[in-house]
Amino acid sequence: MKHLLLKYGFTPATFFQLILITINAQLLYAFWDIRNSVPGGFPAALGVTDQEAGYLYSMQGLVILVGTIALGWVGDRFSIRNIMLLSSLGVGCISLFITLFSPGLSMPVLLACFFSMLFFSEVLFKPANFKALRSSTSEDHQGLVFGLFEFGRGVLAFLISLLWAGMLYYQVAPKL
C-alpha cells in the first residue's frame, strides 16, 4: 500500500490528511445537502414560508460577493488548520443551534445564522480547503488529489442522503 501511495505522490500521513479533509468538507456541507435534498420540507422544518426560504437561500450569493475580497486575504494570513478548525466549529455550532431551536426562530435570527454559516463555509473554509488539498501532494498529482477529494465527497454525500432518506422513511412509513 505504501508503494502505491508513493507512486501517486502521497505518504501515509498525507493520504490520511486527504481523508480527514474530505470527511470534514462533506460534514461541513451536509446541512446544505439536506436543504437541497428536501426542498419542500426544509422551509417547513425551519418554520418559514417559501418566500422567506428564498431570502435565506439568496444569502449564498450575497455572502460570496461580499466575501470575495476576504477569500485570499484570510487564506494567506492565517494557518490553514486554524481556519479549518474555526470554520468547522462555526458551522457545526450554528447548524446545531438551528436544528435544536427550529421552528420558532425569528427571520432576523435565521438570516444571521445563514449569513454566518455561509461566511464560515464559503469565505473561510473553501479557500483553506483548496490550499490544504494542494499542499497534500506534489505538483504532478494535483488532479488526482482533487479527483479523490470529489469522489470521497460524493460517496459521503450519498451515504448522508441515504441516511436522511431512511430516517424520513421510518418517520413517515408507519403513518401510511
Predicted segments, located by residue:
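Intracellular juxtamembrane helix-capping segments at the cytosolic ends
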Residues: V123-S138
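Hydrophobic core of transmembrane alpha-helices in multi-pass small-molecule transporters
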Residues: Q26, S106-L124
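Central cavity-lining transmembrane alpha-helices of secondary-active solute carriers
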Residues: Y55-W73
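Pair of pore-lining "gating" transmembrane helices in MFS-fold secondary transporters
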Residues: Y8-G40
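Short amphipathic helix-loop junctions that connect adjacent transmembrane helices
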Residues: N36-E52
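Glycine-rich segments within core transmembrane alpha-helices of 12-TM secondary carriers
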Residues: H141-Y169
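C-terminal ends and interior cores of transmembrane alpha-helices
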Residues: L89-L105
